[in-house]
């Protein structure tokens, strides 16, 4: 018998393109795939990454500060909030348009500006690992490191990128509001870029200099929503072992035990495919029937 599923879909920031025109094209294609699920009767909650986008925003804000000394530095948490707004804006409108093309004239789509609490003592703050911004050559990376003091690392053989702290999500601050919207059959876009990273100081939520991995945030969200399925979309076709090597092998499916084995072998790059596989293992292991 057909069962309606509650599905959390996580879109990779790299899959959204590197420019605004590219993003407009990408979200239209993504909206069609998401609306296929909605048309089948499933509840869909959308999370998106922001790696390239938050890096570009941060670079622009940094350049402005260097050009005009009266302009203060823009915190990374504020850059994440900016990325939530403009990516959510494009996604929300693309979904709305595609739904109406299919006759869903009264199906509301809403983007929630989402804060996610992290532990200020998370060791990730001492070990930056989350790539943001566009891919650079070695020479470009060396210039950014010297000019702006950024930590730069090679990303899975595809070039160099800036890396920042990526603490694990502890609590989704707006979780109750998200639950209410989903229970009311709204299509919700939330936890953009993993959520705006904040730490709790008394009653005050203070922005943290970090970018939370959207895969871990999606896993936490899916568990809190009691979702049936977590889908993580990427810019590459599939998960692979021996990625980029002569004996590279694409995987059509993967059990939890196999995934744990490959993680132990170091098959997946930190800040890239590793958190995606870890998030899927965590979610699939958290309840019966979860995939």
Please place each PLM-identified region on the residue numbering:
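Short acidic, glycine/serine/threonine-rich loops at helix termini
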Residues: 19-21, 55-60, 121-127, 200-202, ...
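Ligand-binding beta-strand-loop-alpha-helix segment within the catalytic cores
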Residues: 64-188
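N-terminal glycine-/serine-/threonine-rich phosphate-binding loop
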Residues: 1-50, 56-66, 180-185
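Polyanion-binding loop/helix "lid" in catalytic or ligand-binding cores
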Residues: 25-32, 75-93, 98-99, 165-182, ...
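Short beta-strand segments at enzyme active-site cores
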Residues: 8-10, 43-56, 108-113, 188-191, ...
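Glycine-rich beta-alpha junction loops
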Residues: 113-120, 193-196, 236-238
